[in-house]
Amino acid sequence: MPIRILSPQLANQIAAGEVVERPASVVKELVENSLDAGANKIQIDIENGGANLIRIRDNGCGIPKEELSLALARHATSKIADLDDLEAILSLGFRGEALASISSVSRLTLTSRTEEQTEAWQVYAQGRDMETTIKPASHPVGTTVEVANLFFNTPARRKFLRTDKTEFAHIDEVIRRIALTKFNTAFTLTHNGKIVRQYRPAFDLNQQLKRVAVICGDDFVKNALRIDWKHDDLHLSGWVATPNFSRTQNDLSYCYINGRMVRDKVISHAIRQAYAQYLPTDAYPAFVLFIDLNPHDVDVNVHPTKHEVRFHQQRLIHDFIYEGISYALNNQEQLNWHTEQSAVENHEENTVREPQPNYSIRPNRAAAGQNSFAPQYHEKPQQNQPHFSNTPVLPNHVSTGYRDYRSDAPSKTEQRLYAELLRTLPPTAQKDISNTAQQNISDTAKIISTEIIECSSHLRALSLIENRALLLQQNQDFFLLSLEKLQRLQWQLALQQIQIEQQPLLIPIVFRLTEAQFQAWQQYSDNFKKIGFEFIENQAQLRLTLNKVPNVLRTQNLQKCVMAMLTRDENSSPFLTALCAQLECKTFDALADALNLLSETERLLTQTNRTAFTQLLKPVNWQPLLDEI
């Protein structure tokens, strides 16, 4: 068969295979076009699940008569004009494929009128060459698109449609997702002439919560925590549910990037990590999150249906989302929005004004060739780049910090090091000690692991008991070692080193203090500096900016830790001991992890501080048990 150019209709039908999956795909594309046209009132009429008729009516700006034919042409759009526009997309549509693809697999009619026109015009395309026909019509300002007999000319596609009920359920879900991000737009959804959904415009927070309650349920709103988290051009807002409102399936997870509904692995991982300590692995968090960022920093042109995006700074986005959600979950009593509006206003009075984003949005285009959606971006001069700053939303609210989000699974290097660490004894020694251990400790504790491992020249680790302690043997003596106390000792030893490795924070943490807290800071500033913290002090505004932390504490909740140290009783305990008492200890599910901690601690021991370690060893007396045998 010779090479030849496909007919316009066939080319559009091929494109429709990606764009038009089912009636819900048509509704999504057409409603997004209405929103891009500035509509604040959209009506969606469906018949027989969308197979017979889909009608979208809006009150947007409309399409001029001379552009109606182009509207049905492939790769014709008013939303971008050049490559710069493509790299800074804020509109929902931009490829110019939807109308052409839909019209090739259905009987599509487009009727529109602009405010400048005295009459409306209607256009439709038909035939192998998709020739358009324009005729006058009666219509108010705005646009109506009717899609009749979807897949009438591709019977193979039509027979794969589900029942009317199933297809309409998918359409309903599309409208729900769009209504969650376009609060100022009214949506009406009908099926076979009956109104099924009607979302009124929501202009204030109470009205927005009502819409969220209608879509996500009253229980979600009752358990919702409000997020308003900012850093430079990044802004995270919305609601996350408390852990007790976890879901057995992932059916209440809505995330939007610059108003676009997306699915992204980086965002999903950050959210799961933030909930990791609260939810079991088989539970799912519920959330409605809006992420606004510079459009130059995200690429939305990576998926046929634009459901996926790619971030230029994935690590920054991940850490920003993780810290924002973690702060909300750790401070539920502060962020819970079951308060009066006056309380919210009081919080806003205590905020620090966030610097404006370093990009500006141009007004709607005046003529074709101008992009009304792509912002003009101005690079910051590198030599004058200031330190990061952040806006607290509540009193003592702090920005995000560095987050090490490595996978929970050990890397190949870690596995190799573990293998070297877990060197087993010779078989004869294993047998002797194993028999002794089984004879002495059977039925006395829940033994998670019974491997016999040599962890130092003096102590041998026999077992990890209830994830809380190590059972150790030295000659004929046995000891229990608390892992929590061992971890706190390891922190103290690491922070007492002469040279402490520092970790710069990806996003510095900003503290707004009271006068009493600032006085406490001045008293403890040398102590913080000695152990590796680096602050920038602003005495006039009673503000501290944390830029560097000790590497050993990089995964800790530094906001909570620092504030606790500035409000503690100065006579309670030494500074370093009090600081380590504020740190959160990890849980140990494997003997290898516990042995790694023991090895790290022994490496830091010296002749002067070895006593502190030996005091943690609690002798085990087997004699009463032996007497009962």
From Swiss-Prot:
Domain of life: Bacteria
Sections of the chain in a coiled coil: none
UniProt cross-references to Gene3D superfamilies, sorted A to Z: 3.30.230.10, Histidine kinase-like ATPase, C-terminal domain, MutL, C-terminal domain, dimerisation subdomain, MutL, C-terminal domain, regulatory subdomain
Cited CDD domains: HATPase_MutL-MLH-PMS-like, MutL_Trans_MutL
GO cellular component labels: mismatch repair complex
GO molecular function, one term: ATP-dependent DNA damage sensor activity
SUPFAM superfamilies: ATPase domain of HSP90 chaperone/DNA topoisomerase II/histidine kinase, DNA mismatch repair protein MutL, Ribosomal protein S5 domain 2-like
Keywords, in A-Z order: DNA damage, DNA repair
InterPro entries noted in UniProt: DNA_mismatch_repair_CS, DNA_mismatch_repair_MutL, DNA_mismatch_S5_2-like, HATPase_C_sf, MutL/Mlh/PMS, MutL/Mlh/Pms-like, MutL_C, MutL_C_dimsub
Region (Disordered): 376-396
Composition skew (Polar residues), residue ranges: 382-396
Function: This protein is involved in the repair of mismatches in DNA. It is required for dam-dependent methyl-directed DNA mismatch repair. May act as a 'molecular matchmaker', a protein that promotes the formation of a stable complex between two or more DNA-binding proteins in an ATP-dependent manner without itself being part of a final effector complex.
Family: Belongs to the DNA mismatch repair MutL/HexB family.
Name of protein: DNA mismatch repair protein MutL
Gene: mutL
